[in-house]
Amino acid sequence: MTEKGKNFSANNTTDRRKQTDFYETPYSLTRKFLDAEEFDKSLSVCEPACGKGAITKVLNEYWDNNLVTAYDQEVNFLWETGQYDYIVTNPPFTIALEFINKAKRVARNKFAFLLPLSYLHGKERYDELYTDRDLSNSSASRNFLVRL
């Protein structure tokens, strides 16, 4: 693996993720993402879909290790009962909406998700995200949209 991580490449036409269908987020993209948004590094952050730890490695560069919580399949984020100041992740695309809705409830301050802008294509998904009163103003919408 290179410093930039693996590239996102193949399409998966089934609704089940293949075990080999794993793509780490490039370190450089995570750094750019974190630099584009303001975070208080004295507060807690959770990465609930850490995979092999690419985003977590960068989070540990920005935060003290004791403030970073990271897990993957061993804990189901959708059943999470704890709260964190920030949620930062590249969620599984097929359940990204469920991750967003869960993050609205467990992130004390904000959440930041790495998703393609095309994720908002489709009226139903867009309406569900933006009709929520907590996301209806432009500053709150930055919870999950950061232009890179």
Could you describe each region identified by the protein language model?
Residues 1-148:
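Class I S-adenosyl-L-methionine-dependent methyltransferase catalytic core
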